[in-house]
């Protein structure tokens, strides 16, 4: 009666396990026993195979993915073999036939070396000289296991103390933004919830025009058209960056500050008058009292000293001299203000930090420092491909680690936080004649990745990586602009996809003086090369898990769609939850209304699938 059983499994060169079924198992009685001499068998029909599902998910932790296989039209006088083909490396399949019929279960096991992604595979059935196949989609899923312990090596002592914000650059070209969009602004800006909104007045928004002693030397109208509405929203506490000196203190050709004792003192007095204007009831000039319209209800606590000196014709020692002159003059007017130092364009930090943190007697900073600020753009060239932009994120993490290391060499600076006060996809802009400012011989082309689905992956990836590195603020550059840079279209007032990305990052990972940042939970992820995972726990016991699909479809993609990824989020270590929501932002998201928040059923393992660049935010409530 041995012919009534299953023949042993045989292993093909590919590593696929193939079950060879004896025909006698598939028909009444034991005739045939898999041999053509055992009898004529059942006349064959067209050989076919059907599957119980068109998609099989095989997690990288070795949990089998299964599909039921049914064979029809087989010649029962010949053996039937079932195998899987076109499997990616690191995946093994095994077919287990069921007794009493031409069917069974195919198991697919992905090892840790199996690359995550979506593949086209097939089940192949061979019966004598006949062959039939049925294709299916094989998904190799990343597994992210969220632990119940705080990872104290990340963030600020294990906490994600990073707030979201945005920026304005008042000038004669954009100062009417709020006037032009009264139906939506500043309500939309307030909805975004930014903290310490950055204000960087340039050109005619610099309020001091001359130094003649006449009242006409000062004009705040262009600057205040932006500043005054900003003072009414969010935390009512913007950061005013004194980005440049008044034009009469600068070189007419380069626009760079001209160093000299008299110019330094004039710049310091200008800065002190700005503090007087917004915080102390104003100042008198040419017989006229200049005072902020919103004083005393709204004042400005945070001030930044100069913008990107390291690419604007200033040496590190000159910047320190400037800083050490301006800050005391401003503090002498209002001792409660806080100061952001450096505001660097990302370059080689070893050229700037060592001298800044040197002992004051050796030329280091000797004035108050509350924050050290830097900027991060991964490119200044629209032709750079998607993978290049993603690859530069770990570099800014190294940069931040270095800055903290240097600040730690001085006792009075070791607890100073880092803020990234400018961040977007591309720093380039039109130099005025249609050419690139960064690459003058190249035509300027708007980079849509600042508002496309690419941004839905890129900004959350940056947020997670920088927050884990201890960065404490991430500023979007800039609020009202074009499709390269804006959260809101400066012409129409409509929201871009970037608005909703930043909004939900702020909502899901709040960090305010009254609501300290969440704990960063320990995490084990089977693959990090194409997905970013962040798990946090709030003081109320709720847990937020962010899943970012940053998989590039092709190495040449520039604003591509990305590649699908499935992530199995394992929260079994966290116990049970009473409810859960899911929010996804990707290329299908409506940029006007934003993503929908969906109620989902809590489970120990939650599957998240993104069809390309994007982010899913899970919130689990106790």
Predicted feature descriptions by range:
Residues 26-29:
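C-terminal motif of bacterial Sec signal peptides marking the signal peptidase cleavage site
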Residues 141-183:
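Mature N-terminal, pre-catalytic/accessory segment of carbohydrate-active enzymes
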Residues 31-143:
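Long beta-sheet-rich domains in secretory-pathway and surface-associated proteins
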Residues 599-622:
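C-terminal beta-strand-rich structural cap/linker in extracellular carbohydrate-active enzymes
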Residues 420-531:
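Aromatic/acidic polysaccharide-binding cleft in carbohydrate-active enzymes
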Residues 379-437:
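Glycoside hydrolase catalytic-domain groove-lining segments
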Residues 526-576, 613-619:
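Carbohydrate-binding surface patches
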Residues 189-389:
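Substrate-binding cleft and catalytic face of glycoside hydrolase catalytic domains
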């Amino acid at each position: 009666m041995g012919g009534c059983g299953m023949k042993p499994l045989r292993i093909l060169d590919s590593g696929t396990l193939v079950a060879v079924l004896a025909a006698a198992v598939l028909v009444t009685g034991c005739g045939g026993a898999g041999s053509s001499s055992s009898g004529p068998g059942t006349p064959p029909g067209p050989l076919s195979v059907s599957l119980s599902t068109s998609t099989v998910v095989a997690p990288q932790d070795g949990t089998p993915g299964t599909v039921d296989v049914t064979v029809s039209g087989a010649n029962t006088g010949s053996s039937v073999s079932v195998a899987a083909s076109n499997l990616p490396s690191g995946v093994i399949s095994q077919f287990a036939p069921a007794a009493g019929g031409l069917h069974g279960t195919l198991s697919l096991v992905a090892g840790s070396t199996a690359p995550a992604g979506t593949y086209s595979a097939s089940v192949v059935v061979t019966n004598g000289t006949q062959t039939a196949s049925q294709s299916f989609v094989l998904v190799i899923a990343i597994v992210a296991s969220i632990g119940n312990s705080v990872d104290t090596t990340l963030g600020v002592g294990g906490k994600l103390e990073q707030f979201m914000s945005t920026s304005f650059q008042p000038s004669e070209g954009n100062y009417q933004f709020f006037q032009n969009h009264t139906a939506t602004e500043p309500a939309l800006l307030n909805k975004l919830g930014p903290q310490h909104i950055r204000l960087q007045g340039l050109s005619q928004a610099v309020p001091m025009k001359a130094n003649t002693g006449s009242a006409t030397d000062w004009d705040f109208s262009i600057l205040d058209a932006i500043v005054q509405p900003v003072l009414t929203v969010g935390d009512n506490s913007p950061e005013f960056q004194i980005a440049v000196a008044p034009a009469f203190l600068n070189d007419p050709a380069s626009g760079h500050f001209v160093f000299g004792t008299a110019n330094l003192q004039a710049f310091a007095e200008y800065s002190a008058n700005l503090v007087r204007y917004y915080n102390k009831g104003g100042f008198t000039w040419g017989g006229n009292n200049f005072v902020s319209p919103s004083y005393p209800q709204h004042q400005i606590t945070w001030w930044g000293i100069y913008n990107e000196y390291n690419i604007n014709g200033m040496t590190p020692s000159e910047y320190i001299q400037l800083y050490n002159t301006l800050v005391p003059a401003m503090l002498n007017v209002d001792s409660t203000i806080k100061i952001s130092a450096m505001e660097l364009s990302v370059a080689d930090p070893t050229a700037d930090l060592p001298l800044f943190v040197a002992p004051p007697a050796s030329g280091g900073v000797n004035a108050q420092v509350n924050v050290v600020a830097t900027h991060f753009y991964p490119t200044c060239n629209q032709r750079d491909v998607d993978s290049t932009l993603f690859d530069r994120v770990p570099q800014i993490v190294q940069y931040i680690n270095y800055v903290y290391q240097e600040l730690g060499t001085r006792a009075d600076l070791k607890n100073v936080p880092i803020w990234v006060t400018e961040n977007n996809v591309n720093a380039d802009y039109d130099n005025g004649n249609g050419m690139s400012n960064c690459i003058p011989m190249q035509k300027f082309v708007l980079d849509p990745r600042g508002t496309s689905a690419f941004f839905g992956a890129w900004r959350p990836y940056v947020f997670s990586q920088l927050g884990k590195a201890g960065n404490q603020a991430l500023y979007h550059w800039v609020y009202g602009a074009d499709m390269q840079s804006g959260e809101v279209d400066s012409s129409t007032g409509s929201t871009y996809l970037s608005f909703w990305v930043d909004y939900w990052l702020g909502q899901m990972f709040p960090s305010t003086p009254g609501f300290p940042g969440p704990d960063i939970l320990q995490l084990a992820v089977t693959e990090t090369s194409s997905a970013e995972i962040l798990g946090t726990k709030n003081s109320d016991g709720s847990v937020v898990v962010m899943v970012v699909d940053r998989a590039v479809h092709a190495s040449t993609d520039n604003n591509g769609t990305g590649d699908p990824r499935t992530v199995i989020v394992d929260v079994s270590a966290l116990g049970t939850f009473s409810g859960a929501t899911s929010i996804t932002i990707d290329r299908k998201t409506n940029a006007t209304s934003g993503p929908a928040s969906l109620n989902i059923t809590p489970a120990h393992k939650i599957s998240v699938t993104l069809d390309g660049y994007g982010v899913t935010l899970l919130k689990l409530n106790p």
